[in-house]
Design a protein with these regions (language model features):
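Conserved G/P- and acidic residue-centered "switch" motifs that form tight phosphate/ATP-binding loops
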Residues: 201
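Conserved amphipathic alpha-helical segments that form helical-bundle/coiled-coil interaction surfaces
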Residues: 92, 109-174, 188-196, 204, ...
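Mobile beta-alpha loop/short-helix "lid" or hinge segments that flank ligand
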Residues: 67, 71-72, 165-167, 182-184
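Short linear motifs at protein or domain termini
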Residues: 1-105, 109, 217, 221-229
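Juxtamembrane/interface motifs at transmembrane-helix termini
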Residues: 59-60, 110-113, 137-140, 158-160, ...
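Short helix-capping and inter-helix turn/linker motifs at the boundaries of alpha-helical repeat units
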Residues: 18, 116-117, 181-184
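Short alpha-helical transmembrane interface motifs in multi-pass membrane proteins
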Residues: 85-86, 172-176
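Alpha-helix N-cap/N′ positions at the starts of helices
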Residues: 76, 99, 121, 185-188
């Protein structure tokens, strides 16, 4: 987000809870994208000036991020960035492999026609952009596929947890898509999951979604992509 956009945060929201949430999202994104590095000190006054807000929503956002383990509060100063470590990433993918399977299984039983059509559209567009080599678009479509599946699971808690996990490892996911042959492979895996969901085969959908995560973990390990965390 550019400075001009950040300076208008106050104009985009009308109450302190929305403002705090917006500030939280901006800072969190900068941590997860690597713009704010591990160990970097985040000063309340500097952040407030950068975002065009008072120190109060910045302080509240940093406290919320401390609860997520993304920063460590430094009294009377601000916070130190912790971010997502390589060990965190391993834990996240281990949990995702189980929860994505559960999510796909629920989706096989609960998905509606609109959601199914959306997944099919995403798979079709992904094939198109694989051929074009449009990696930014592939990353966006990968996000969309998983978000629609989370919604189709009908589980509010699964959607919340998996959406956070998906976002936490965005840097390494993007790097994984750049690795040779992975962009084509991940969509073939998506299409297999989609077919199982379409057939309402819960067990098959669970196994394929679980395997999809394990294949991603293997690719990350083979390419040494954990260094991107």
């Amino acid at each position: 987000m550019g400075k001009k956009g950040e300076s208008k945060i106050n104009q985009e929201v009308s109450d302190k809870y929305s403002l705090r949430g917006r500030v939280f999202q901006v800072i969190r994104e900068k941590i997860l994208s690597g713009e704010y590095k591990h160990g970097e000190e985040l000063k309340e006054t500097a952040l407030a000036s950068e975002l065009g807000v008072s120190r109060t929503p910045v302080r509240e956002a940093l406290r919320q991020m401390e609860l997520e383990g993304l920063v460590k509060i430094i009294p009377n100063k601000g916070a130190s960035v912790i971010g997502i470590t390589a060990e965190d990433m391993e834990d996240i993918y281990s949990m995702r492999s189980l929860l994505e399977g559960l999510c796909a299984g629920f989706a096989a039983e609960r998905i509606n026609e609109e959601q199914l059509d959306k997944l099919e559209e995403i798979a079709y567009l992904t094939d198109f952009h694989v051929k074009k080599g449009n990696l930014e678009k592939l990353y966006e479509l990968d996000n969309q596929f998983h978000e629609v599946m989370y919604e189709a699971s009908g589980s509010r808690m699964l959607k919340h947890v998996l959406s956070d996990f998906h976002h936490y490892v965005e840097r390494v996911r993007k790097a994984s898509l750049l690795s040779p042959g992975r962009s084509q492979m991940f969509n073939e895996e998506h299409k297999a999951i989609l077919e199982a969901i379409r057939e309402k085969d819960r067990g098959k959908a669970e196994r394929l979604a679980n395997a999809h995560m394990k294949n991603t973990i293997a690719n990350i390990s083979e390419q040494g992509l954990e260094k991107n965390v």
